[in-house]
Amino acid sequence: MTFNEKCVEAQVGNMNVKISTGKMAKQASGAVVISSGDTMVLVTVVGTKEAKPGQDFFPLTVNYTEKTYAGGKIPGSFFKREGRPSEDETLICRLIDRPIRPLFPESYLCDTQVMATVISAEEDHDPAILSMIGASAALMISDIPFEGPIAGVKVGRVDGKLIANPSAEQLKLSDLEIVVAAGKDAIFMVEGEADFVSEEDLLEAVFFAKDAVQGILAAQEELARQVGVAKREVAPLVVDEALKAKVKALAFDRIAQAFKIKAKQERYAAVAQIKEEVVAALAEEFEGRDKEIKGFIGDIEYDRMRHDVLETGIRIDGRDTKTVRPIAIEAGLLPRAHGSTLFTRGETQVLAAATLGTSQDEQRMDSLYGEYRKKFMLHYNFPPFSVGETSFRLAPGRREIGHGMLAERAISAILPNHDDFPYTIRIVAETLESNGSSSMATVCGGCLSLMDAGVPVKAPVAGIAMGLIKEGEKVAILTDILGDEDHLGDMDFKVAGSADGVTALQMDIKIGGVSKEIMQQALKQAKEGRLHILGKMAQCLAAPREEMSAFAPRITTIWIKPDRIRDVIGTGGKTIRSITEATGVMIDIDSDNSGKINIASSDKAACDAAIQMIRGLTDEVEEGKLYMGTVKKIMEFGAFVEVLPGTDGLVHISELDETRVKNVTDILNEGDKVLVKCIGVDKQGKIKLSRKAALGQSLEEKD
C-alpha cells in the first residue's frame, strides 16, 4: 500500500521543521505530522459539518497529550497509562488555543477539535512550538474556514544575541524566554518570562520572532496548495434587522445610563433588568427568541463601551485611559501563615499567603525528559463567590493553571539563590473579588507575602493588565482593565516586573493582530502603571522583614566530606533516623554527593544538637587541634581517650604531664574529662594524643 504523502519544510531558527500529510490519520478533517530533530507531533483537526441547532458560540476544543512512549518511558501511575493532563500539558493547550481562536469566521459555529499528540520527543526540539505550528498547518489543509496561517516560535537571548528556538543548554544561559505566535503581518500572542529585561529589548525580541516564522508560514501555504482541499462555504450570520431595530429602540438609551453606574454588581443588575424587561416587551411579537434579543442587547453593550472610550476617553468606571484603580494593601494579617498580604485594586482583591518549607516539600515533576523538582510553586484559586456566582468546583481549571503560572514566572525572577536561601517556597493566591486583572493582583500580593515572610527577594515586582479598543484608525490603550473591558475589548496584555525591567508578560489578541506601534505604547503605559503600583506597595513594605515568622522552619547548612555521608545515613538509614527522632529536626542530604546537609527546625537548640551529632559522626581528628575527651580505658603505658564519638586515641604515659608520671591513675581515671591535643596520626590511622601539650590552654583560646 502506498500513501499519497505531501511534505514541506522550512528553517525556524535552530529548528529545521518538516510538515507532512497523507500518511497518518487520514479520516480527520486535517492531519499533519510535524517534526524537527527526533521530535514528532501528530496534529489533527476535525470540524463537524453542521452547527448544533441554536448554537450561539464557537465550540473549539484543543487537546495536547505527551505520550510517555515518545520519551521511551512507561507511565509511573498504578494503571500504567496516561491519565489526566499534567500542568505542562494544560499550559501548552492554552498556547495552541489562544492564537488560533480569533482566526475563525464569526459565523462558523461548528464543533471543532484540535488534538496534538507527541509521539517522539527530543529536549532540544520543543514539541509545544511544533504543536502550535502543526495546529495551524492542519487547519490550513482542511476544509475548515481559517484565516491563517500562524506559527509559534520560542525566543531566547544569550550574551545580547537573540536566538529563535534555542537549545536546552542555550535556554539555561538566556535572560529571556518568550513564546510568540505571529502571522505574516501581525502578532497574535506573546507569553514568557525574563530577568528584568527592558521594554525596548522585549519589543525587539517579539518582532525578531515575527521575522523568524515567515518561512514556515510560506511552507504552510504551499502545503495547503499541494493538498488542494477547498474551504467549506460558511453562510454569514442572518440578522433580523426588524428585531434588532426594536431592541435598539427599547434598550440603547437605557444601556447608556446603566453604563454610568461605576459599581460592577449594580451595573450588572441594571443590565440584567433591562434584558428581562426588553424580552418581556417583545415576548408577544417575537415569542421564543429570548436568546436572540439578549444577544442584540449584548451588541449594544459592546458598541456603547467602545464608543464612549474612543470618543470621550472616559471608561465605564469614570477613569481616563491611563489611571490605575485605587489600591489598598495590608500585610501580615494571617497570624500563623509565614507571610500574608491582602491586596485590593478597585473591585479586584487577592489574599496571598507564603509558606516556607524544606527540600522534602519540593514538588516532584515528571516529564518526557526525566524527573525534576520544583522549589517554588504558586497556586492561583478563583472561587465562584469572587464574581458573585455559584458553581461545582473540583480540580483547578485551565484558566487557573494558566494564571498561576504567569504569576509564578513573574515572581521567580526575584527569588534569592537557593544556595543562599535553601527553602522550598509556596504561594497560594485566593481571589476573593474579581473585576479584571486578578492574575496581576496575584503578582503584587504574592511578592508582598514573600517580603512579609522575610524572604530576601532581589526586588519587589508588580503586575498590570493593559487593554485595547480599536475601530479603524481609532485606538485607545487602557491601563488596568476591568472585566468588561477585557470581555468587550480587543486585547488582554499583562505585564509584570520591577522598577528595572520586565519579568513576565502575556498578550492575547481578539482581532487580526496588533502592530509594533500599539505594542510599544502598551508597554510604555504598562511601565508607568507598574511604577505607580510599586510605589503603593513600598508604602506597605519597603523591604523584606528582617525576621522570619516564628512558625517558619530555620534551615542551617553544613558541609561534610562526601565520603562521610554514609556515616550520617547509617545502615538502612538507622543513624539519620536516630538523629531526627532524638532532636525533632528535618535533615536533608543533597543527592549530588557534594557533602551539603540542610538541617531544618523552628527550635534553634534542637538544630544545634543535631549539628553536634552530625559533626561527631563526620569530623576527623586533626593534628595540632585541641579536644575535650573522655577517658575510656586505662593501660599501664597510657590512657585511651575518646575525642569524637567512636573515635579515640592514646595518651602515652610520657605525654600525661610535664613531670615524670609513675602510674597513669595518678593523673587520669576512666570516665574523666580531659583536654588533649592531637600530636600525630600514623599511617594506620592510630591517633596520638598529649595531655602535656594541652596544659595551660583552653578550647576557647584555641578557637
From Swiss-Prot:
Binding site for Mg(2+): 486, 492
EC nos: 2.7.7.8
Alphabetical UniProt keywords: Cytoplasm, Magnesium, Metal-binding, Nucleotidyltransferase, RNA-binding, Transferase
Subcellular localization(s) per the UniProt record: Cytoplasm
Main subcellular location: cytoplasm
Residue intervals of the S1 motif domain: 624-692
GO BP term (any one): RNA processing
Residue stretches making up the KH domain: 553-614
InterPro entries: ExoRNase_PH_dom1 (IPR001247), ExoRNase_PH_dom2 (IPR015847), ExoRNase_PH_dom2_sf (IPR036345), KH_dom (IPR004087), KH_dom_type_1 (IPR004088), KH_dom_type_1_sf (IPR036612), NA-bd_OB-fold (IPR012340), PNPase (IPR012162)
Catalytic activity: RNA(n+1) + phosphate = RNA(n) + a ribonucleoside 5'-diphosphate
PROSITE patterns per the UniProt record, alphabetical: KH_TYPE_1 (PS50084), S1 (PS50126)
Alphabetized Pfam families for the sequence: KH_1 (PF00013), PNPase (PF03726), RNase_PH (PF01138), RNase_PH_C (PF03725), S1 (PF00575)
One GO cellular component, as annotated: cytosol
Highest taxon of source: Bacteria
Membrane spanning stretches: none
Top EC class of this enzyme: transferase
Cofactor: Mg(2+)
A molecular-function term among this protein's GO annotations: polyribonucleotide nucleotidyltransferase activity
Protein family: Belongs to the polyribonucleotide nucleotidyltransferase family.
UniProt xrefs under NCBIfam families: polynuc_phos (TIGR03591), PRK11824.1 (NF008805)
Role according to the record: Involved in mRNA degradation. Catalyzes the phosphorolysis of single-stranded polyribonucleotides processively in the 3'- to 5'-direction.
Protein name as annotated: Polyribonucleotide nucleotidyltransferase
Native organism: Trichlorobacter lovleyi (strain ATCC BAA-1151 / DSM 17278 / SZ) (Geobacter lovleyi)
